A protein has these predicted regions:
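Contiguous, small/hydrophobic- and glycine-enriched helical/loop subdomains that border
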Residues: 1-38, 60-62, 66-79, 83-94
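Cytochrome P450 core scaffold surrounding the K-helix E-X-X-R motif
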Residues: 50-57
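Mixed-charge, Lys/Arg-rich low-complexity intrinsically disordered regions
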Residues: 90-104
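Short coil-to-beta transition motif at edge beta-strands of beta-rich domains
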Residues: 108-118
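Short beta-strand-centered aromatic/proline hotspots
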Residues: 125-131
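SH3/SH3-like beta-barrel fold
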Residues: 138-142
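A short macromolecule-binding patch
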Residues: 146-155
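Conserved small/polar residues in nucleotide/adenosyl-binding loops
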Residues: 162-166
Length: 166
């Protein structure tokens, strides 16, 4: 999407936004053992040709059709998404982590160099988002140092919010 739409960015960890409005969400589920991945399930939802949204998300959501100004054909879009996924997955397998992708990810990271509000299961704090590390954790800087934040438990209480428009 970022190669075709100006203003496209990643909102860590799993949203694609265009000028701050969500156009795509990605959900993952993984089953692992100590040193083995049993399976990974990935779900991608893209707002393709919607022209209206429910009132509660109208200000925060968009679609490719609204951003591009024309109807977007789904088949070529899905083919392009799958091709890019395959390319990125190949890089991931070569490195065994996200180190081969983190520079591009950080370039597209809308959270980078912004003050964010971390709402964790055990603590809440403001920090500055610096980028991601090789495991995909968001690197944040607080007064007492620099730390990775994973949002790790998958609970809805673990999240990150913007606090300023840097």
């Amino acid at each position: 999407i970022s190669s075709r739409v100006e203003g496209c960015a990643i909102k860590w960890p799993n949203d694609i936004v265009i000028d701050g409005r969500k156009v795509c969400g990605i959900l993952t589920e993984m089953s692992t053992q100590i040193d083995y991945i049993n399976h990974v399930t990935i779900g991608v939802g893209i707002n393709v040709n919607l022209t209206e949204f429910p009132e509660e998300i109208r200000e925060t959501a968009t679609s490719l059709r609204l951003e591009c100004g024309h109807v977007v054909k789904r088949a070529p879009l899905i083919a392009a998404v799958m091709k890019r996924f395959e390319q990125n997955y190949t890089v991931f397998l070569e490195h065994g982590d996200l180190s081969g992708l983190k520079e591009r990810y950080s370039e597209l990271l809308v959270n980078k160099d912004r003050e964010v509000r971390i709402l964790g299961a055990k603590e809440q704090y403001n920090a500055y988002a610096l980028g991601i590390n090789q495991t995909g954790e968001l690197i944040v800087r607080k007064e007492d140092g620099t730390f990775p934040f994973s949002g790790g438990t998958g609970r809805s209480t673990d999240c990150l919010l913007y606090t300023s428009d840097a």
